[in-house]
Every structure is written in C-alpha cells, then in structure tokens.
Amino acid sequence: NQIDGKSAFYLYDTFGFPLELTVELAQEEGLTVDEEGFTQAMEQQKQKARDNQNFSAKLSSDSSLYEELDASITSEFVGYELLEMDEPTNPLDLERITALNDGSKWQKSLKEGEQGTLITAKTPFYATMGGQKGDFGTITTEKGRFEVQETVKLPGGRIGHIGRVTAGTLTEGETAALSVDTANRNNTCKNHTATHLLQEALREVLGDHVEQSGSYQDGERTRFDFSHGQAMTAEEIQKVEDIVNRKIEENLSVETKVMSLEEAKKTGAMALFGEKYGDT
C-alpha cells in the first residue's frame, strides 16, 4: 500500500520525476509514499557526493601524495582513438595498473568497498579540464572491478581514475580492461559543442562584447557564464535558442585536431577569460 522512499528517490534521481508528482499519482491509485524515506535517500546521496568530492579534491590537490612516485610512472590519454581497452588484439587494448592510492598512502592492492585512485600508463578516460567533466566507467581485472566515479589530472601530468572497488580486489601490476561510459562521454561532448554554438549565437544576438567567463559541461547539461549590461529579453533568448537549434539540425561534422596555439588562433579560435593555454 506504500511506495518506499528509495523507489521514489530512484524515480527522482534517475528520471527527474518530482516527488510531488509521485505522491499525486500514488494517491490516485490509493497508495501512499514514504516521504521520510525519500528524504533519507536524498541525504544519503548528497553525503555520498560530498564524500566523493572531498576524496577527489584531496587526491588531486595534495602533491605530497605523488612525491614518492617514480618519475617513470606517467599517463597517456588515448581517448580520442579508443573508448574501450578490453580486447587483447592491440597493445593499447589492455593496461597494467601502475599505482593505487587509498587517499593517504600508496597501496599494493585495494579490496571491495575501498575508495582509491588508479593510474595506468595509457587510458581512454578523459580527465576533467577546460570546463568539461571527466569520464566515468569501469576498470576490470581477472580478480576485481573498479567503478570510476571521476577522472582528474594529477601532479606530474598523470591521469587519476578515482572511485571505489565494487567487487574483488585490484592489485598493482595486474592487467586491466578500461571501459569508458560511452553514453555519458557522447552526451558530454554534445554539450561541450553546444557551449560553443551558444557563445556564437549570443555574440550574434547581443554583440561581440559577449565573452566566456566560465563554463561547465557534463553528460546532462551545459552552463555558459558571460557578462552583459542587462537581463536578456524573452525575444533575445528565443533568437539565441533558434540559432543554436538550427545549427544542431544542420548536423555539421565535428573534428578534433591537435595543433599549435598559434595555428589555432589563425583558424579563428578564441582564447578566453585569461585561460592558461599550453603550446598545443
């Protein structure tokens, strides 16, 4: 006779189904909803997110954790060519775990339930940078499975896969299969491209003074920060939406190219909001 709080929260968290609507529909069927249980599930999710965020921040900012690592331990991003490295037909397809950290010290292994960061010499996982949130997915060995909840750039140019062991044990030196959540990556890339479309549309409607002061993209949304002397009118917002949607409907091809900063500027690329760019 009652929809439990966890189920109600699952509808909200996974499908964006408001609690109020769940309650209303349940009442129509003579059911109730455990709203207290919903609130508890919500708080547990928030606490988990806070824990993961704090853990990620510690791993990515505490340079002392990496001073003892051998300088030969590096990471190469191969995610433009591969999203999975799990077929033993190519030298890039499988990688060895070169380092594991539990947030306080380097370990030889991590067991089920433990949080940590994994480093491999090559990875298809994109690390958070340039406003785009890093990939998540799985790293699997013969003896364990690791859920990658965040991917970050670490001191020394390394890429860290941060997450939790969900089954078995992962040990340094083991061969691992790396698999990016492709749906999330594709959605994130679409939202990143949409950010550029949005910027151009805003400049067309509001003027060339519009410059990006910040942005954020993940698999669910994009955010574009800019300065304008006044609030946009409903008509201006509609014009911007129409321009962006027309470009999306054109289904233009998107290419990824690596070039020098000078070459990029010649193609019309904009260096924005004091961003620190490297040579490529």
Where do the PLM segments sit?
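A glycine- and charged-residue-rich anion-binding loop/surface
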Residues: 1-280
